[in-house]
């Protein structure tokens, strides 16, 4: 039945090739791709459910097949030591107890990766709005380590709107000034919500219209144009 259709497709885990795309999502994706290729610091901001993690999934899936190593961290209580050791673990390295030792080892591994493996590092940190000032300062400190006059890595920091509000405060101004690219994910207009639903249904094997225009408008109104609630709305 119709409920089964929703349960089957409006869930996480849809292959990246089948994700909904439009001009806005494409612009965010291209900005992130540019940040990765140029080893820049990018900020991705949007309310819960607006597609931050989806955008990051798409980026990672594309970069993984190229000359990049992509590392992903998402932890609300992230400390500088856990940050470095989390990255080292993903690189297959032994962790270090002291922050400075872990940082130095990471820099060493990055130099090998770039010089010998000819690979660029992309670090994605999700849930950035939950990070402490100490952790955000550590990110800036990491980026200040220069190799060949380039950044040692691309860093993509994603979080809810509170992250942007925090970075605009005077106490965080030095971090904000370090940001190279800003991406803001906004709720969908009605036409985008409709296209999003149709894309999901096509992936589910239902290319024909099964929702009325009024039903789609009701979904858009209920969800306020935010993709995640659309995905879990049962009509």
Residue ranges and their predicted role:
Residues 25-35:
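Pre-Walker A adenine-sensing motif
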Residues 65-75:
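Conserved catalytic segments around the Walker B and adjacent sensor/switch elements
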Residues 112-116, 147, 165-227:
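Helix-loop-helix "sensor" segment of P-loop NTPases
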Residues 131-132, 143-171:
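Sensor-1/coupling segment of RecA-like P-loop NTPase cores
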């Amino acid at each position: 039945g119709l409920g089964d259709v929703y349960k089957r497709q409006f869930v996480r885990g849809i292959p990246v090739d089948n994700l909904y795309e439009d001009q806005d999502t494409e612009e965010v994706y291209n900005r992130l791709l540019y940040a990765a290729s140029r080893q820049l610091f990018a900020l991705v901001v949007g309310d819960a459910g607006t597609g931050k993690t989806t955008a990051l999934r798409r980026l990672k899936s594309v970069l993984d097949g190229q000359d990049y190593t992509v590392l992903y961290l998402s932890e609300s209580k992230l400390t500088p030591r856990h940050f470095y050791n989390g990255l080292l673990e993903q690189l297959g390295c032994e962790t270090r107890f002291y922050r400075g030792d872990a940082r130095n080892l990471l820099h060493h591994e990055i130099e090998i990766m770039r010089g010998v493996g000819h690979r660029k590092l992309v670090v994605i940190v999700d849930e950035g709005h939950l990070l402490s000032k100490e952790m955000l300062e550590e990110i800036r400190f990491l980026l200040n380590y220069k190799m060949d006059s380039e950044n040692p890595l691309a860093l993509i920091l994603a979080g809810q709107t509170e992250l942007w509000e925090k970075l605009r405060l005077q106490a965080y101004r030095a971090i904000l000034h370090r940001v190279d690219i800003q991406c803001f994910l906004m709720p969908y207009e009605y036409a985008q919500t409709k296209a999003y639903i149709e894309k999901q249904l096509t992936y589910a094997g239902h290319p024909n219209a099964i929702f009325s225009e009024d039903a789609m408008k009701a979904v858009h109104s209920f969800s306020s144009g935010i993709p995640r609630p659309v995905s879990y709305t049962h009509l």
